[in-house]
């Protein structure tokens, strides 16, 4: 594969980065194998070995992977920290932090290695992970040869892109290429899983975003969903934001803070997650505010209650006005 005159100047740099990431992943697999741990590639590194395997033109900054258990994750972290890695946050291996975050981030100590996110479940977002039923467990069970099943992979990637407001074009491209590779039966299975695992809004938003970016042929797939009144309102809300969010803008900062809420399918789940936001567990509170000592929670609990209560009301008003 050689660059052509029509390809952007960054093409060779992207390919070099891609090859470095692939080489790093093979090294990590070898390290994991020496301690009897199986890892499952996620996101970019997974796609580089599947739909982008021939072109290698998908930018990847770091490596996301999944361990099948918390114990395997701890063992792999210990192994990699003996080599060229260190924990991004020293508290991330505490039981309460693992329960809240569901992943551990490792930073590279050398320029020839890339940063790593080691998941213990596929979906780690604090609200999504609690509202998708048994998806995480079922998706792991359906893995074949340490790879996620295709429709599970699409839903996983869609929720990640939705969480980040579809702000990067590469995520939409990933979803489109995966959809193009699906048979009609797989598309039907995808719709069934979206209903089963409460991924309806995520799926609707992803397909709607693809349609708005020129993939009009997917309108038929969108029409396969019998939209409720609240789902139509949700799509209007999502469609009202077409610019990249800028966290320096107060409104954008507010929307991004609560964006995940809008994608939760069931009203009772949204209310349950709101209660958790108002009254977080010690692990979640520690993760949000990077609390270093247990005593500091006495200050952060009332602070969180005031801030979360005020901003959630503002978000609710904004959602109503925008939809």
Protein language model annotation of sequence segments:
Residues 1-61, 67-323:
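Conserved NTP-donor binding/palm subdomain of two-metal-ion nucleotidyltransferases/polymerases, i.e.
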């Amino acid at each position: 594969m050689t660059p052509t005159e029509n390809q952007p100047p960054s093409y060779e740099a992207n390919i070099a980065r891609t090859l470095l990431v692939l080489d790093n992943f093979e090294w990590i697999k070898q390290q994991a194998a020496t301690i009897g741990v199986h890892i499952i590639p996620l996101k970019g590194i997974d796609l580089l070995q599947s739909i982008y395997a021939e072109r290698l033109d998908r930018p990847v900054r770091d490596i996301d992977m999944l361990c099948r258990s918390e114990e395997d994750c701890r063992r792999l972290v210990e192994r990699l920290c003996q080599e060229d890695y260190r924990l991004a946050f020293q508290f991330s291996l505490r039981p309460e932090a693992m329960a809240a975050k569901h992943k551990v981030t490792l930073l590279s100590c050398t320029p020839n290695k890339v940063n790593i996110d080691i998941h213990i479940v596929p979906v780690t977002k604090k609200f999504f992970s609690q509202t998708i039923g048994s998806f995480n467990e079922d998706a792991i069970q359906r893995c074949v040869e340490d790879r996620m099943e295709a429709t599970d992979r699409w839903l996983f990637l869609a929720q990640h892109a939705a969480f980040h407001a579809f702000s990067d074009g590469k995520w939409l491209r990933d979803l489109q290429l995966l959809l193009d590779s699906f048979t009609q039966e797989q598309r039907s299975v995808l719709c069934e899983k979206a209903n089963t695992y409460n991924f309806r809004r995520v799926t609707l938003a992803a397909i709607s975003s693809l349609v708005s970016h020129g993939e009009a042929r997917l309108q038929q797939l969108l029409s396969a969903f019998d939209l409720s009144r609240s789902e139509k309102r949700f799509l209007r809300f999502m469609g009202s934001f077409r610019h990249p969010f800028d966290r320096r803008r107060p409104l954008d900062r507010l929307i991004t803070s609560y964006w995940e809420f809008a994608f939760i399918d069931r009203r009772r789940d949204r209310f349950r997650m709101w209660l958790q936001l108002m009254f977080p567990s010690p692990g979640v509170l520690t993760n949000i505010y990077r609390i270093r000592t247990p005593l500091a929670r006495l200050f952060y609990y009332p602070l969180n209650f005031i801030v979360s209560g005020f901003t959630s009301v503002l978000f609710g008003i904004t959602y109503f006005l925008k939809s």
